[in-house]
A protein has these predicted regions:
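Short helix-loop boundary/capping segments
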Residues: 153-162, 166-167, 174, 530-585
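Proteolytic cleavage junctions
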Residues: 25-29, 39, 68, 109-131, ...
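A short, solvent-exposed loop/turn motif at the edges and junctions
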Residues: 58, 77-103, 111-113, 328, ...
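C-terminal motif of bacterial Sec signal peptides marking the signal peptidase cleavage site
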Residues: 13-15
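Bacterial signal peptide processing site
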Residues: 17-20
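Structural motif
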Residues: 30-52, 286-301, 382-394, 556
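Solvent-exposed N-terminal domain segments of exported/luminal and surface proteins
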Residues: 123, 376-502
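Short, ordered, surface-exposed loop/turn motifs in non-cytosolic proteins
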Residues: 37-39, 45-60, 67, 77-79, ...
Length: 632
């Protein structure tokens, strides 16, 4: 797992980066680009084993699953009805539908079912094929090319796969059971499904002439359906086919229920071939809720599957993490939310919950408690330094030492990356040693530095307050992007200092140009954070004489206050309970070499805020003072 920058070991190190191998990328005017996003997920067989080399396709993009069954479709244009097709030799094709809101990664997982049976016959002859308990009667010379519509003559290969909807086989059926009936939208209750695919001798997809339909008989079952829903011999029932273009089940005609000693069957005519379904359509009720991540931020474009005895519905969360799914009143329904982060599937299930609502709109929906997925989606940090430095021990004169930096990264997934790094340093504890030794005290997930997964938020990133706007150009350390305010510049041989101005109580706003290559859209948030109270030493300098160092200070706020010191290569970092004074233990200072160094005292605010595309980011704000430190 990549190491993520969350907090610097010392204030004086925050926002400071090695200038070696660093190139500044000068910004052009931001270019308005259309949003693009990604769709990711996993494909499994019905036993839960990952399927590799599955072709995953939309109208414009294709990808193949890896060995672990994962896939990512890149550069997908947002749409509220993106149909995804999943195809692999030896398996019945499947379809899912997802909504992509903007720049984020939408989630779509699916399962494929092995083909039930394969047969070959001559297109010029009347043929009856029975495979997987399904019987199909084809008329002679009834076949046409599925693309051109031209008549086809030659051998035909047929693949037939039957689905019993009372089993896990339903997971391999297209989308969910949302449908468009003759009287409007419906929620289907299925009794049996079949996928029939026809191929010519050259692998071309075939279908039948609509004027010469095939006759199909499939096994059906009432399962554990309520008596009101059960079918009997002699009943008629609607036929429904799945439309790959529209991504929904469509009512077509009617068929007849027959039966024998082997059970019930559904017989109907098929004027074309795709997935077919024996169903009843009902006006559904609805259930609504929200999906959040480990730190409580809404998860947009998560996949939510609502499944019960009569309910099968899959939907996508909106930009605020909310969803509405179709449910059947009187059903017990489980709600499973999934999101694709860091190349892994993260999910959580809530339920089963009894559906007693009869609402037909989101305002009347059965309320579902938040589904919290244990996934870390923190994607960056903005570091602000509100800082004053005393020039020498004999003067009260101070200079501003404010600073600013930011870095963004791919969300890691594992919740260890969401642990508050400040919790590693206990109240009353001090760390001493070199920079590397102090850093090693933090959990590995919080080590400072630019992470290997760093990504660009655009050509520039800007922080604003009442005093001005501070735009930082994107800079690269090697190939890793970050943003840092350039405090010093060389103008004709003169070193010019230019610092941002921050003061306690300032409200900060942020904005960024966005970067389509990193799937970050243009971003602007007002009042994202407030500068905390600025802590000041009670004296202009400190002297360490070998014993404990008593430090008095003013203007702290909150429960804790931080102290840092540095001399040569040695450093100290402490955390104390806020009481107006603290004592730095002698052992913590013993590693500092004799001579002069520096000490700082500060409030440290580490909060989560909405970042690019709604992902949580840290705002890390230091507010304090530094003074000379004499070590005897």
């Amino acid at each position: 797992m990549t190491k993520t920058l969350i907090i610097a070991a010392l204030l004086t190190l925050t926002g400071c980066f090695n200038s070696d191998n660093t190139d500044t990328v000068l910004p052009d005017d931001p270019i308005e680009t259309q949003p693009i996003g990604r769709i990711g997920g996993f494909v499994e067989d019905l036993s839960g084993q990952p399927l590799s080399n599955v072709l995953v396709s939309t109208e414009t993009e294709v990808a193949y699953t890896a060995d672990d069954g994962s896939y990512t479709l890149e550069n997908v244009s947002p749409d509220d009805n993106i149909v995804i097709k999943f195809t692999k030799s030896g398996y019945a094709s499947n379809y899912e539908v997802v909504e992509l809101i903007g720049w984020e990664t939408a989630t779509s997982n699916t399962a494929l079912m092995g083909i039930g049976g394969v047969a070959t016959f001559n297109s010029t002859e009347t043929s009856q094929i029975t495979l997987d308990d399904v019987t199909v009667d084809f008329q002679a010379n009834s076949f046409i090319d599925g693309v051109s519509g031209n008549p086809y003559t030659g051998n035909v290969m047929v693949e037939i796969t039957h689905v019993d909807p009372t089993t896990d086989e339903l997971d391999a059926a297209p989308r969910d059971l949302s449908a468009i009936g003759s009287d409007g939208s419906s929620q289907l209750v299925s009794y049996g499904m079949v996928d029939i695919t026809l191929y010519g001798i050259d692998g071309e997809v075939l279908t039948v002439n609509p004027d010469m339909p095939a006759n199909i008989k499939i096994p059906i079952t009432n399962g554990s359906l309520n008596e009101d829903y059960q079918l009997s011999v002699g009943d008629t029932q609607s036929t429904w086919s799945f439309s790959p273009e529209r991504g929904i089940w469509v009512e077509e005609s009617v068929g007849t229920i027959t039966g024998d000693e082997d059970g019930l069957f559904f017989t109907f005519e098929a004027p074309h071939f795709s997935w077919w379904n024996c169903d009843q359509g009902f006006v559904p009720s609805c259930a609504s809720g929200r999906v959040i991540d480990f730190v409580g931020f809404p998860v947009r474009s998560a996949e939510v599957t609502c499944a019960g005895g009569q309910t099968t519905s899959t939907v996508t969360t909106d930009e605020d993490g909310y969803y509405v799914c179709s449910v059947m009143v009187g059903d017990y329904v489980s709600f499973t939310a999934s999101t694709f982060v860091g190349g892994r599937d993260w999910h959580k299930t809530k339920g089963a919950i009894f559906m007693d609502s009869e609402g037909s709109s989101a305002a009347d929906c059965e309320p579902i408690p938040d589904i919290q997925i244990d996934v870390c989606r923190i994607a960056g940090t903005v570091n602000v330094e509100n800082y004053e430095a005393s020039l020498n021990e004999d003067s009260s004169e101070t200079v501003a030492a404010d600073g600013l930096s930011a870095v963004f990264w791919e969300p890691p997934g594992d919740i260890s990356y969401c642990n508050n790094p400040l919790d590693s340093l206990q109240v009353g504890e001090c760390w001493s040693g070199t920079n590397d030794e102090i850093i090693s005290n933090y959990p590995e997930s919080s080590w400072p530095g630019i992470p290997a997964s760093a990504r660009s938020a655009g050509l520039w990133f800007e922080v604003s307050n009442a005093h001005g706007s501070y735009r930082m150009e994107r800079t690269l350390q090697g190939v890793l992007p970050f943003y840092a305010w350039q405090t010093h510049s060389d103008e004709n041989g003169d070193i010019v200092t230019d610092r941002p101005e921050f003061n306690q109580g300032d409200l900060l706003a942020v904005s960024a140009a966005g970067d389509s290559g990193a799937y970050f859209g243009p971003w602007a948030v007002a009042d994202i954070a407030e500068i905390p109270s600025q802590v000041f030493f009670s004296s202009n300098s400190l002297t360490a004489t070998g014993g404990n160092l008593l430090v008095d200070y003013t203007n702290a706020s909150g429960d804790d206050v931080f102290f840092a010191a540095a001399a040569g290569d040695e450093q100290v970092l402490c955390r104390f309970e806020e009481a107006g004074a603290f004592s730095v233990p002698a052992h913590a200072l013993s590693s500092l070499p004799a001579g002069f160094g520096g000490a700082s005292v500060f409030n440290l605010s580490l909060e989560l805020a909405p970042g690019p595309d709604g992902l949580p980011i840290y705002t890390q704000i230091y507010s304090g003072q530094s003074v000379p430190l004499s070590i005897e």
